A protein has these predicted regions:
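Amphipathic/hydrophobic helical signal segments and adjacent flexible N-terminal regions
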Residues: 2-48, 52-54, 113, 122-138
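Central antiparallel beta-sheet cores of small beta-barrel/beta-sandwich binding domains
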Residues: 30-106, 111-118
Length: 138
């Protein structure tokens, strides 16, 4: 009876802590987050940007397009411009690691926040708590 109780306790413990849940994928949760930003673009972020927090960003946005792609801070970048806001996902190996939202802050400057992705045990894409992020166009 003790062995059965011990085995059941281990099974419950194993089920309670699902460590193999997938992290947010850029093609699924990331795309859904970006698609939810629906305003037409009112700015273009194409070019090289410098961020104290992340280093250089090389962003590409075609004229009239909302879609943004590029790289920076050791990550691939996928994003959209919605109105006067830039929404970016930082990802590696198809997994979202950070989310950022930035708005114009003077000429050739963007300011906003970035946050870590949520842990594998929580639903959603990125955490509520965030840190400041600033970018200046070169």
């Amino acid at each position: 009876m003790k062995q059965l109780t011990f085995a059941l306790a281990l099974l419950l413990l194993y089920i309670s802590f699902p460590t193999s849940l997938p992290a947010a994928k850029v093609e699924v949760e990331g795309k859904a987050w970006l698609d939810a930003q629906k305003d037409p673009p009112e700015m273009n972020v194409n070019g090289v940007w410098d961020s104290e927090e992340w280093g250089d960003f090389h962003l590409t946005q075609a004229d009239g397009s909302r879609d943004v792609s590029g790289n920076g801070g050791g990550y691939h970048i996928m994003g959209v411009v919605s109105g006067k806001r830039l929404f970016m996902l930082f990802f590696a190996n198809h997994t979202v690691d950070y989310c950022a939202t930035l708005s114009p802050n003077g000429e050739n400057s963007l300011a906003g926040n970035y946050s870590n992705r949520k842990s594998r045990l929580h639903s959603g894409l990125c955490q509520e708590s965030s840190r400041p992020m600033n970018m200046k166009k070169r």
